[in-house]
């Protein structure tokens, strides 16, 4: 693989530190996980083999708890929504509650301080708790029951009423409408609050401002939002208009509170059926959103993948995605009507190999799908980000649906950055997503970032749970997930460091470090393996990948001018002859070192693969090397003879193989699990996958290095395309070059789409674990050759490599939460 590391910045970096990260590794202290406390005091936890065990919970116990959550979705009760359902009367009798079990639950679930809601021990009072408490008080007063509960609830509200006035406090969706609406109901029933009238007037003033303000969306989005919070509008709401948002399950936006308010104000029989079914299933309390199984389980799967621990739950994840797939093909509203849920489902299903088209995403092809929705009214960055990410999972170059979604969502996200109206934490997420598209992210690097930003239960006490109209804890077992992720990341770093030491020894043993021209970068090349094939059990695949990365880069330097024509031809003949190399001999010590490094390493890899492959596959490795050096020799001859290929196609006939992905993937594929038959290596599918990966790498390399290569007398695709479209020299050279870059980007995008389609499709001769290696390679190449902001610098790559292999996790926890790890 040809890395863009021949640039001046890397040369300076190598001269400053010839051993690269190996030197730092030898000086590195034992691994520790750095913990930042709430007061900013940094502590360190020395971790043994099992961090989870040292913190009081065995690894298998962590897995069992997470596995249980995956299998059984546990709905978080919403005191707010339960209170609204409790206010629904029996039809024909306004003096009798239709759902007495909801009243009973409210009376049994008041907290000692008089409040209701998701106020975990130690959490601060927030607007959600205040809203839930007021709703429960009003519900009890509606049926003239629970006088003591009402008294204690009113006392709590009086003590904390200031929270409702604090505009800096995070609020549930529509709080200024829902809270004031309940306050209006409460005063109408004769309830008296131990607060000043001016404070109550202040709440109604905030309500007036909310009703009059222009939000981020359109008139359509405002109507949808007002229907969503309709329980807070009372007589101001057009209840017939609300029914336009009724779903097939007869709810209003899957919201029990909005549906209950609709029944109360209009006695809608179909909406009542939704509530009857809901209360019957859950035996009393209701959640803030129902149904939410699909959303909750998708979030769990997505979280486990982002934290790097999904491999522990492959069976459960497969079952969940099978269920999601069934919902998708049946176009179920639970999945399809929510922008974020639909986009997440599309991304996960497609990346897991389910055969789905982008037709289900067609509803979001116009920006109006966002602007005219509740998401637009609330400026919902999370849903927009999910939509943007899903648009990048393109398997067809001419997929106009995903192309249009990606175009407008990227533009809106960029506008959010420019306007600076997005919360700081969300802003960082937007900037990161725009800088690193899905096809240019490396899993282990992403996972470390996610682990360090993951919120524990302790943090949620301070920062609050995800808020809809009321607090929503979801199905995430926060502390268990974090503990398992920290443990596995730490364990993998220990493995990575040992493998890096072994690779350093291999470099010395092969005598590659005696070659003055060799760019020996075991740390950087190993990073590309560890960041994609991160599970500890893929050790041999990582080592084979890295060894061949180092070898191909060294051989490329040799053919780029450090070897004479005689030496280059000699090396090509030796590799073609392979076991019969003794008949040819070596033209120089340099050639001898190179050949034996390739030959002996390939034989060792093949021998290690015998138990998995049930045969010796060294011939396939040797053949991949033959294709590679043959292409390199052709390019070298062009350079020495000052020959310019007449077409891009002629150039690519050699340049694709010379990019040298072949030896890397062929060697690593032997260790990823499945047995690879002769049929696999000879199949059109395998050859096409290899050609696409090499093409992607070659085009990325050409687009970044064409200016330097022109000065060196080398040709590449950008220059050739510009020459062929310059009108015989009559056109502008600059314009021709820009047109060439645009065309090559189009070809690159098409190749990337084709590769993803082959990698994710169901069936095929090449086993899925092997196919994934080609996608990993593509992601590495896009990351390495990233043009934006000059990211690919020596310092940038060094920092990324250190983050995965060396640097301890920076996990932010409150001191009282340390024991949960």
Swiss-Prot record:
Mg(2+) 2 binds at residues 556, 560. Changing residue 664 to T: Changes catalytic activity. Converts ent-copalyl diphosphate to ent-pimara-8(14),15-diene and diphosphate. Its EC number is 4.2.3.103. Mg(2+) 3 binds at residues 701, 705, 709. The Asp-Asp-Xaa-Xaa-Asp/Glu (DDXXD/E) motif is important for the catalytic activity, presumably through binding to Mg(2+). It comes from Oryza sativa subsp. indica. The gene is KSL5. It catalyses: ent-copalyl diphosphate = ent-isokaurene + diphosphate. This is Ent-isokaur-15-ene synthase. One of its GO terms (molecular function) is magnesium ion binding.
């Amino acid at each position: 693989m040809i890395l863009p590391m021949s640039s001046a910045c890397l040369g300076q970096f190598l001269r400053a530190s010839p051993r690269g990260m190996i030197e730092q590794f030898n000086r590195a202290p034992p691994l520790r996980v750095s913990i930042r406390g709430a007061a900013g005091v940094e502590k360190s936890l020395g971790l043994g083999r099992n961090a989870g065990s040292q913190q009081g919970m065995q690894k298998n116990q962590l897995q069992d708890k997470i596995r249980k959550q995956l299998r059984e979705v546990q709905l978080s009760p919403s005191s707010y929504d339960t209170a609204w359902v409790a206010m629904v009367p029996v039809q024909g009798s306004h003096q009798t509650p239709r759902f007495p079990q909801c009243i009973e639950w409210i009376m049994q679930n008041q907290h000692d301080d008089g409040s209701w809601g998701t106020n975990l021990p130690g959490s601060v009072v927030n607007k959600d708790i205040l809203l839930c408490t007021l709703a429960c008080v009003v519900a009890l007063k509606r049926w003239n029951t629970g006088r003591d509960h009402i008294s204690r609830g009113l006392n709590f509200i009086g003590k904390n009423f200031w929270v409702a006035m604090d505009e800096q406090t995070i609020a549930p969706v529509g709080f200024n409408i829902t809270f004031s609406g309940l306050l209006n109901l409460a005063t109408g029933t004769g309830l008296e609050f131990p607060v000043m009238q001016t404070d109550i007037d202040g709440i109604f003033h905030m309500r007036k401002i909310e009703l009059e303000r222009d939000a981020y969306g359109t008139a359509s989005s405002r109507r949808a939002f007002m229907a969503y919070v309709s329980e807070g509008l009372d007589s101001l709401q057009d209840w017939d208009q609300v029914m336009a948002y009724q779903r097939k399950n007869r709810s209003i936006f899957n919201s029990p509170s909005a549906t209950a308010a609709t029944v109360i104000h209009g006695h809608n029989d179909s909406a009542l059926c939704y509530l009857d079914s809901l209360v019957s299933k859950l035996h009393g309390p209701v959640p803030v959103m129902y149904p939410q199984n699909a959303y909750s389980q998708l979030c769990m799967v997505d979280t486990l993948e982002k934290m790097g621990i999904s491999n522990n739950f492959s069976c459960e994840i497969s079952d969940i995605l099978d269920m999601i797939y069934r919902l998708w093909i049946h176009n179920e509203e639970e999945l399809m009507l929510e922008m974020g849920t639909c986009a997440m489902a599309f991304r996960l299903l497609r990346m897991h190999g389910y055969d789905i088209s982008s037709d289900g995403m067609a509803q979001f092809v116009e920006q109006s799908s966002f602007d005219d929705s509740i998401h637009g009214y609330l400026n919902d960055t999370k849903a927009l980000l999910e939509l943007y990410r899903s648009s990048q999972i393109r398997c067809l170059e001419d997929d106009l649906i995903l192309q249009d979604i990606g175009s407008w969502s990227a533009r809106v996200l960029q506008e959010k950055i420019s306007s600076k109206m997005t919360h700081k934490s969300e802003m960082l997420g937007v900037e990161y997503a725009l800088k690193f598209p899905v096809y240019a992210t490396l899993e282990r690097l992403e996972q470390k970032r996610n682990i360090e930003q993951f919120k524990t239960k302790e943090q949620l006490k301070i920062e609050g749970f995800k808020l809809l109209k009321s607090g929503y804890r979801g199905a995430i077992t926060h502390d268990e997930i974090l503990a398992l992720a920290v443990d596995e990341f730490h364990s993998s770093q220990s493995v990575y460091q040992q493998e890096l030491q072994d690779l350093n020894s291999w470099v010395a043993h092969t005598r590659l470090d005696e070659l003055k021209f060799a760019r020996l970068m075991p740390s950087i090349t190993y990073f590309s393996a560890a960041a994609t094939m991160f599970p500890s059990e893929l050790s041999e695949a990582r080592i084979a990948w890295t060894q061949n990365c180092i070898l191909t880069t060294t051989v490329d330097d040799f053919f780029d001018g450090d070897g004479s024509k005689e030496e280059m031809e000699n090396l090509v003949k030796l590799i073609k002859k392979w076991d019969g190399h003794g008949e040819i001999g070596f033209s120089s010590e340099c050639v001898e070192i190179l050949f034996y490094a390739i030959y002996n390493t390939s034989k060792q890899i093949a021998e290690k693969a015998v138990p998995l492959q049930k045969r010796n596959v060294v011939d396939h490795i040797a053949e991949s090397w033959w294709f590679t050096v043959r292409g390199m020799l052709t390019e070298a001859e062009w350079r020495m003879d000052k020959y310019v290929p007449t077409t891009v196609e002629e150039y690519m006939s050699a340049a694709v193989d010379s990019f040298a992905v072949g030896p890397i993937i062929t060697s690593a594929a032997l260790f990823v699990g499945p047995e690879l038959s002769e049929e696999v290596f000879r199949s059109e599918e395998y050859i096409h996958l290899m050609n696409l990966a090499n093409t992607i790498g070659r085009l990325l390399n050409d687009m970044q290095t064409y200016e330097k290569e022109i000065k060196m007398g080398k040709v590449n695709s950008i220059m050739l395309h510009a020459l062929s479209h310059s009108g015989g020299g009559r056109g502008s050279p600059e314009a021709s070059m820009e047109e060439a870059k645009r065309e090559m980007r189009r070809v690159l995008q098409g190749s990337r789409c084709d590769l993803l389609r082959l990698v994710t499709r169901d069936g095929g001769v090449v086993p899925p674990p092997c196919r994934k290696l080609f996608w990993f390679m593509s992601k590495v190449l896009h990351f390495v050759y990233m043009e934006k902001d000059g990211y690919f610098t020596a310092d940038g790559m060094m920092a990324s490599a250190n983050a995965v292999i060396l640097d301890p996790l920076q996990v932010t926890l409150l001191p009282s939460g340390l024991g949960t790890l």
